[in-house]
Regions:
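S-adenosyl-L-methionine-dependent methyltransferase catalytic core, i.e., the SAM/SAH-binding region
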Residues: 1-311
Length: 311
C-alpha cells in the first residue's frame, strides 16, 4: 500500500454527525488517505460514496484502501470547491451528506519533498496539486513586499509580518530563496530574540500563510460553503472540520447565514423579504477532540467540527 497514511481526526464524531443511511449518497471533499471514507463506505449497502482530492498521491492511496468497496465508490481528482461540477459530471442532483476535513494532511506535512515542513530541507513547493502553476517559490521570490506582508499578517496572523517580508525581499535580491530551510533562516533573521525563544517554531505562522496563499485555501472554503448547502437534500448534513481560526470563521459565518430566516427590520409588521432558514445548526459550539484522541494524535488539538442539517 502507498505510504500515504493519515490519522483521521474526530472520526466517530463525524460518522455520528453525518447520520449515515445505507442507501444514501455521501461526499468526502477532502479524501486524503480515506480514513473517514473507509468507515463511511462500510456503512453503505446500495448507497454511493464520492471521494474528492486535488492530490493524486492521496487518490492513489485511497483507491488502494477502498479497493474492497469500489462497487459503491467514485473517486475524483478535483478541488472540493468544484463540488457543483463534480456532482453534475456524475448526474447527481442532491446528496445526503458532505464531509470536509480542511487543512494539510499529515502525510503532506511529513513528506519533506513536498516543501510544507519547516523542519526538513526541501525545494519551496507547498502545492497540494502538483499540476498547479503557483508554488511557494514563486510567492517568496516574485511577490512584492506589500503582498508578502499582507499574507503573512492575514493568513499567518504573524505579528512580525513587516519585518519578515522585508527580510525576504532583501535576501532574494542577492539570490533566489530556493529551499525551506533557507526560508526558515530568513524568517529567523527578521525576528527579535524573545520571539525565537517562544515554544512555537518561529517559521510556523509564515509557512501556514504561504501554504494558504499557494493553494488558495480560504477561497476554496468560501466557494464550497456557497455550493455545498444547496446540494444537500432535505435532512442531509454538512460536517466541516477546521484547523485554524481563519477557516473556522468562514464556516461558522456561512452556516449562521444559511440558518437565518427573515431579515426584515423589526419595525416591519409582516415579512416582505421571504427569506426562509435553509439549515438548522446542530453544533451550537464546535465539537473538539477529547483527551484520549489528543494523546493518540496531538495534531487534533486545534480541530473543530461544525455540523448543519438541510431543512
Amino acid at each position: 500500500m502507498s505510504e500515504f497514511h493519515h490519522v483521521s481526526v474526530l472520526l466517530e464524531e463525524c460518522l455520528e454527525a453525518l447520520h449515515i443511511r445505507p442507501d444514501g449518497i455521501y461526499v468526502d471533499g477532502t479524501l486524503g488517505g480515506a480514513g473517514h471514507s473507509s468507515q463511511i463506505v462500510k456503512r453503505l449497502t446500495t448507497g454511493l460514496h464520492i471521494g474528492i482530492d486535488r492530490d493524486r498521491v492521496a487518490l492513489q492511496a485511497a483507491s488502494e484502501r477502498l479497493a474492497p468497496y469500489m462497487d459503491r465508490v467514485k473517486l475524483v481528482h478535483s478541488n472540493f470547491s468544484q463540488l457543483d461540477e463534480v456532482l453534475d459530471s456524475l448526474n447527481i442532483e442532491a446528496v445526503d451528506g458532505i464531509l470536509l476535513d480542511l487543512g494539510v494532511s499529515s502525510p503532506q506535512l511529513d513528506d519533506s519533498s513536498r516543501g510544507f515542513s519547516y523542519m526538513a530541507d526541501a525545494p519551496l513547493d507547498m502545492r497540494m496539486n502538483a499540476q498547479d502553476s503557483l508554488s511557494a517559490y514563486e510567492v517568496v521570490n516574485t511577490w512584492s513586499q506589500e503582498e508578502l506582508r499582507k499574507i503573512l499578517f492575514e493568513y499567518g496572523e504573524e505579528r512580525y509580518a513587516p519585518q519578515i517580508a522585508g527580510a525576504i525581499v532583501r535576501r532574494r535580491e542577492t539570490k533566489p530563496i530556493e529551499s525551506t530551510l533557507e526560508l526558515v533562516d530568513v524568517i529567523r533573521s527578521a525576528m527579535p530574540p524573545q520571539a525565537l525563544r517562544e515554544k512555537q517554531h518561529p517559521a510556523k505562522r509564515s509557512f501556514q500563510a504561504i501554504r494558504i496563499a499557494v493553494n488558495d485555501e480560504l477561497g476554496a472554503v468560501r466557494r464550497v460553503m456557497e455550493v455545498a448547502i444547496p446540494r444537500l437534500r432535505k435532512g442531509g448534513r454538512l460536517a466541516v472540520i477546521t484547523f485554524h481560526s481563519l477557516e473556522d470563521r468562514i464556516v461558522k459565518n456561512a452556516m449562521l447565514e444559511a440558518a437565518k430566516g427573515c431579515t426584515c427590520p423589526p419595525s416591519f409588521p409582516v415579512c416582505v423579504c421571504g427569506n426562509q432558514p435553509k439549515v438548522k445548526i446542530l453544533t451550537k459550539k464546535p465539537i473538539v477532540s477529547g483527551s484520549e484522541e489528543l494523546d493518540r494524535n496531538p495534531r487534533a488539538r486545534s480541530a473543530k467540527l461544525r455540523v448543519c442539517e438541510k431543512l
